[in-house]
């Protein structure tokens, strides 16, 4: 099908600013030269309403004035006229194409430029029309307001669309080509040379190809050309086919087009279309042909012209109906049908695309709305989630509370039902048993009342709150209560088979087949309605609900509504929800409404009942009026009855109070009597124990006459020397027999004695019998031990005869010959006492004061046994680890014949050592492998199973205070050893309290000194209370105590037995807190509430006690040094610089070359020119000739210090004439004028002042004045200098007088330069960066000037000194002192690095400042010092101080290894240059001899005064020839003062017990406390707080309360007091010098390794093959009481009691 393509609404040369969009065909090629014609989407109104930018005039509305569509120019009036503006472009330019034009020519001006990029053929023949055109959307055609063109139908030319022609015009009217240039004849009048049309393209590949122009337009005056016959015939043959191939297309305008084109516009369009038709022939719209050039067309001849004219005339005269081809109407209808089909298909496709676009838009819109909804939900959740959660939680909590209340209420009601049931049964049983009818009726009424209560309670349990009488009304029973409304009944249905409760399973009713089918049909109908987007017909549920409710009411039970098929949307879930709603209503709402109605009904009935009662009262009022007198009588009787009742009640109350008071007094008197009886019983029990012990002591004392001889030198013996006289103090004494009683006396156990009897005769007899039995047991035990030894056969049996104690008095023991040393007199007496004890089988305590030779006395006993009795062992010596070497050395030294086996080391070593003695039947002789085994307490406990297998002849415990706790495993293990005798060596038998002495006595005599609480309390309570309260001690009790101790303990003090030993002077030095210490102390005190501490201390909680001890430790730290809390650190400003990174030091050699590479962050780049000589203004040279002006003229010609000028001035007696009197030449003056201040000072430093020596030669002022040289006349300062005189006076008073200014200058610290401020940041000088090497050289010379640095603070090194000697150079210039004084810190030097000042370190502590002054004096006096500390951290600080003062020292604490301790002590003893020995009080106070020192300083005191005594006795002992001075540093007004007072109280206890003296000389008016923790808490308070606490305590005592004590506080405190003491907690982790640990602690001396190895139990562990192993020990910070007890095993009872 052929036809013209649809026209475009715009001409290409009439392009608007915003061209109309028309999508190009997909197959159309792209042409680069058509870029200006490319179309884009429209953004403005249609382009036909815009004016073309290519024309300067409006388009003409006349169709005749339009230019030809083929692009040719309109007819010209003259051939010489230039081409018109409508002239088509040449073929070489833009090609010409056919224009689609849907708009009429009256609106758009035509132009031949085509928007397509196809070239046009160069011939003039019209080309064939394309079969098709690229399809565009039908909607694009609606953009035009004129759907029909005036030149054709649907945009096609009228020449190709056949219209019904009009009637034929008259024949005389013949149109010519001039008249009708667009006629068919005019078209056929073309050139003679025509080319065949190009082959037709397929519809898929066809492109719009325009027709070539037929001929050049001619004017109407020129004759038409004549065509040939052939040409005419050819045109005739082709015309029908052309017209026949064109269909007719008619299309009605759409609604949108009608809206755009009004009817009048359509009418105008139709008229315009009709006017273009003439003579029944449709006028062609335009000829789309491209004319060739004018010269290419041939000129017809005259003959050809005539023939053409003739043919044209024939054609004009002929009938034109013959041009219509047959079948044209059919083709037109087919074409229109196809057009309609295509339009419909396009419209459907557009609808589908529009639907897809709508769906896509709706999807995007839904996603956007979904996002908005999600965001809104998140915002709402974020804003309200917390409140909702809180609300839900609150609701749950409230529901839980209500549930608990309901459960409690239910339980109470169930209990009520159960009790009422019991009452009912009891009442029914009593009624059944009652004989009297009235009594039976009474019981029945009680049963009925109980039944009613049970019923009411059960109804309450079931949740029924309505009154009983309402619920009992049934439809069948009449309502007898009355009322204004009738009653109705809602009955209950039969109980359902399902379980009760909301959570039980619910059985749905079965449905019929019809119901199921109806539900299925309804579901299918609903699904189909949903698919068709139709509304669902949902039927309401009201009617079924009403019907079901009616059925429920009628039926009397609740039925579940069944789903009905009325709803089109009835599903299973819907029905379930619907039924669940109704079930909830039936379960919850209906009972609630019922209860409300029932309650309202009961309220109404109650009101009606009250109304009836009032009415009845009103009706009976007339009767009361007549009985008024009776009513008054009744009122008087009631009043009388009330008065009588009140009287009797008051009387009964008074009697009850009196009865209670009498009972209370009786109970109190009974308690008092019982207390008195118990006191008497305890007194008798105590008296029995003391009497028994006194008898034993008496028996032993009469045998041991040697102890009596010690009375001259032993104050304890003097105190206990008098015997007990009969008849004096009969309440506390018994008669001493002259001999031992009958051996057959019955022995009574302590538990079987009757202490309630008033007669004490039986108790005295029992005490005597028990004492005799104890003596006999000791004798039998010694005999039994000796019976197994062959060496004991030679003993005299009579000496062991306890029936004849007088024979012991004749024994006189001399010093053994085996002993190489010479015993002193008191030591020989001690040996005599020890031997007597051994021969009697009695254990003892040698308690000589420290330093009197307890060790040598013990060794002499072993030598005596070996020499006299041939007993060579085995002997067991147990001592602290620090004294093991001392024991081994002294035994080997004094008794070489006795072999010593040192038992210590690792487990493997000890296993090898046990081979020497681990035999059951070994015989010890002089040739045995060993005689004495020396070991430590820790190893004894570890290897207790092996020690228990051996029968030891003698066991000596050195420093026996290690077993002062009878509850420790160490005490129990040692007590279980098989040994004949035990000897305890201790210099301080009483350290903290009398309980420790009692533990020692209990150890040596377990059967006699049994662990009775009464005896131990008497031992400690009375004496300690005497020391605290300064009261008078019972002399009789003290005397009895001394008698008890006399046979078992021997103690001598130094001042009585050793006259040659120097005195010991103790001085307390009080120090004040510094500002920093006071701030720390106040801050600690403000943060602690003393009242809370005291209240907690009264309770006695272990955690509170630990907290209290921690506080005490913090306060003591403040007193010692504040740096124990926080050390001063090295500070430096922030350095803003680049630091060079060094290479790996591993790859370097021994010396690493570290150059100065620090650079500033700021660098100034400088050109090479400025750095060189040419860029300097003041440097003259070839590059800078003008720079020498300043040097030439200003520095030389104009300088007054030139030699020429000065010489002229001197000659003329000018300004420089003074140079001749100051010893200065012209050259020197010139040189000085050109030097700076620093250079002049450096040069003057090396000059020798010769003029000052004249003061030495001429000491007279007159001679000195006459000795002035003329050339030094003006050198007044140099001549008066006394430096040479000072050098002559090397020492003495003269030198001091001559150097007063210098000494003052140094003493005041004026020679010390300190920075005033420390910068926050520092940086090196800004460096200059240049390609020249001159800046680096100048920087190096400026920063590192050797001469300047040497002059300021440099000292000659060793290499310089060697070079001076080798080269023999004058050393004066190199040995001058630096110009700058010594910096404060040698490490920090003159930098901004602040190193902590040692002066500040010393002055920050008041103690350290006092110690600094004291050490200076002692150093000057030639003394040597033992410095004791409680904290090892303080020892660390003291090491820094001693290093700062250059004092030589050595250190020994718990971290020192055992093998190093011996060497350290030896160094101090042998090297006098060691000035100070730093020791820990607990570790360095035992077993070492430090007599080289004569001064002892306690930096901080110990809780236990005996610990300090042991420490100071390291120097004050045998071998000390000088006076020992003890200094104790105490901080005034702090806790240390109170600790010292408490230590003095403990010392008084020891003095009273041991010496027996009265309490005098010391003020003991201190606070008496039951709780030691409470006493320590008082130490933390100051005087004002202590006074306030005392006042509150006094008020509490007046009220009969215990101040600060809670419930069970006293019992808890007593219970914990037995477990651990406060002093143990304070010294937790410390050892007693016997540590073998090498790990230093942080706060105090640590626990020894041996103790930490294991935790031995009280019973010996069984043997485990190769040994027990070493295991891990407990930490020094163990928390439990059991671990602490194991940690301090044997150290219990060190608390500040």
Curated annotation (Swiss-Prot):
Alphabetized Gene3D superfamilies for the sequence: P-loop containing nucleotide triphosphate hydrolases, Tandem AAA-ATPase domain
Catalysed reactions listed for this entry: ATP + H2O = ADP + phosphate + H(+)
Domain (Helicase ATP-binding) ranges: 835-1007
Residues in coiled coil: 383-466, 623-694
Cellular location(s): Nucleus
Span list, region Disordered: 1-324, 398-569, 615-637, 1626-1697
Enzyme Commission code(s) on record: 3.6.4.-
InterPro entries to which the protein is assigned, alphabetical: DBINO, DEXQc_INO80, Helicase_ATP-bd, Helicase_C-like, INO80/SWR1_helicase, P-loop_NTPase, SNF2-like_sf, SNF2/RAD54-like_C
One GO CC term, this protein: chromosome, centromeric region
Keywords assigned: Activator, ATP-binding, Coiled coil, DNA damage, DNA repair, DNA-binding, Hydrolase, Nucleotide-binding, Nucleus, Transcription, Transcription regulation
GO molecular-function term, one example from the UniProt record: ATP hydrolysis activity
Amino-acid positions noted as binding ATP in the UniProt annotation, renumbered to this chain: 848-855
Family to which this protein belongs: Belongs to the SNF2/RAD54 helicase family.
Name under which the protein is recorded: Chromatin-remodeling ATPase INO80
Source organism of this protein record: Aspergillus niger (strain ATCC MYA-4892 / CBS 513.88 / FGSC A1513)
